[in-house]
Amino acid sequence: MYPELLKWVTIYIIIYIVPTCNVPSANNMGNLGTKAAAFAAFSMHSRTMFHVKHFHRKAPMKKKTKPLRPRRRLVGGIFLLIALLLAGFFGYCFALSRVLRVERATVYLPDLPQSFDGMTVLFVSDLEISGLSSAGEAASLMRRLALLKPDVLILGGDYASGSLMDALNGTRDEAALSAARQRFFSALADFPAPMGKFAVAGEQDAGAAQMEKEMAAGEITLLNNAVGRVSLGGESISIAGLAPQGEGILDYSGLSRSFQKGDCVLAVAHNPAAISAVMTAEAGDSGVWCDLILSGHTHGGQMILGKHSMLTLSPQETRYPAGWSKESGVFILVSQGVGCEIVDLRLGTEAQVHLITLRRGLAL
């Protein structure tokens, strides 16, 4: 702005002011000299302005771009931070899956015979063994649980399942799963449960005939829509094992009618989707036919984020996701299980087994 103003001021001086100036001179040449000097000054100023303008036009072309290295470092740092956060998150979820809690509970049953007052039941479900090494870990776990000295051991199904790679590839090695189950069941031969060891099958397990063969090595009784009886002091209680959901219609009336009101019955169903059918079935003389229902399968959702879970549960399973409840005088337990489906990760849930003490009478 200022160079332009100076230029026009100079022109104005030359044209209008210089001719009228009273410059001391001997003749007209003095006035002409003054004009020439002014013109020369203007010419020099014009050249100066040209160079200034030329400089201002060229300067933007010489501007250097900023180096990209700091930006690349920033992006790399962000990705590294995200990777570390994800690694920490999944590491935490994996650690949760490896911590087993022994949940203790006391249940009061009015129909429990006096001889069984104080009897303890260890309920273990959903081991989800994925190979021989995993079977060895499960066997080692059971040796530690033997220190609890339960009177009865009840296994809740889904003993072996495929690995993450099997799930991704859509494959299932039945021979390998059978070998893993056999190793686990064989390790239970010395498990101290003086009143018996009972089990039901889950949807991921083999057929009843194959499961009976595998469990025989561990002296475990498979209950597939069948009843096991425990006797003590001339009295007895019944353990009714229900077949997995995939084997026929959920109608347990044939089983329930074999009992009378007042009998003490523990019902074991791998999937809590069967609980509604168990509750609607009636005893031979009508009324509720069981006192306690034990179930598993859901893993509690395994990973819980807000109202969403990693596992897709049916409406029936969602009704009994995990924990204790009571309906029509019947106690219901849905365990979150020991193992995990597909991958060993938990969030908002826990690996658990249950040591249940049965007492005669009504809850205080």
For the regions a language model picked out, list residue spans one by one.
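N-terminal Lys/Arg-rich, disordered targeting/topogenic segments
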Residues: 13, 45-73
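Conserved beta-sheet core of the metallophosphoesterase superfamily
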Residues: 273-354, 362-363
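N-terminal membrane-anchoring alpha-helices
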Residues: 61-112
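Active-site neighborhood of phospho(di)ester-bond hydrolases with catalytic His/Asp-centered motifs
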Residues: 123-125, 153-158, 196-203, 223-226, ...
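Beta-strand-turn-beta hairpins that frame and shape the catalytic cleft
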Residues: 109-122, 220-221, 228-241, 260-264, ...
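Membrane-embedded segments
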Residues: 119-221
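Binuclear metal-dependent hydrolase catalytic cores centered on His/Asp/Glu-rich metal-binding motifs
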Residues: 209, 213-226, 232-285, 346
